[in-house]
């Protein structure tokens, strides 16, 4: 099981969704969670360092989740960070685009705590966390 001190960054322009994800993470024992409202805000926080996992929405103003993902993967300092996309984009082409851009996992909204836990555990297992 992953380190409970792992620092998460939850990126979503909808504050209620950020709060839902934060609360689900808390239920799973992860209390070290920060929030960002779009990709630009997220990058500013990520460049300060210290994060171990990103959970990001797709559709956001300024910089969407896919652009954020591509930017993270192109930056050698952040490229290994796991990124879980949590989005209403359920179309096959969106899921393929996220996978090709390097998403560690993909969850379609709405989702349950069990679904989030299952995806996180798969990513932790794959990365040996």
Swiss-Prot record:
Cofactor-binding details, from the entry: Binds 1 Mg(2+) ion per subunit.
Location in the cell: Cytoplasm
Pfam families attached to this UniProt entry: Response_reg
Key words, A-Z: Acetylation, Chemotaxis, Cytoplasm, Flagellar rotation, Magnesium, Metal-binding, Phosphoprotein, Two-component regulatory system
Metal-binding among keywords: yes
Keyword tRNA processing: no
Recorded GO MF terms: metal ion binding
A biological process from GO: archaeal or bacterial-type flagellum-dependent cell motility
Outcome of mutating residue 59 to A: Diminished rate of phosphorylation
Highest taxon, organism lineage: Bacteria
Residue ranges annotated for the Response regulatory domain, each copy included: 7-124
Gene3D superfamilies referenced in this protein's UniProt entry, alphabetically: 3.40.50.2300
Cofactor: Mg(2+)
Residues modified as N6-acetyllysine: 92, 109
Gene Ontology cellular-component terms listed: cytoplasm
4-aspartylphosphate modifications at: 57
Result when mutating residue 109 to R: Abolishes function, decreased autophosphatase activity
PTM text: Phosphorylated by CheA or acetylated by acetyl-CoA synthetase, depending on which acetate metabolism pathway is available. Dephosphorylated (inactivated) by CheZ.
Residues annotated for Mg(2+) binding in this entry: 12-13, 57, 59
InterPro entries cross-referenced by the UniProt entry: CheY-like_superfamily (IPR011006), Sig_transdc_resp-reg_receiver (IPR001789), ST_Response_Regulator (IPR052048)
Protein purpose: Involved in the transmission of sensory signals from the chemoreceptors to the flagellar motors. In its active (phosphorylated or acetylated) form, CheY exhibits enhanced binding to a switch component, FliM, at the flagellar motor which induces a change from counterclockwise to clockwise flagellar rotation. Shows autophosphatase activity which is enhanced by CheZ.
Assembly and oligomerization: Interacts (phosphorylated CheY) with CheZ (via C-terminus).
Protein name, per record: Chemotaxis protein CheY
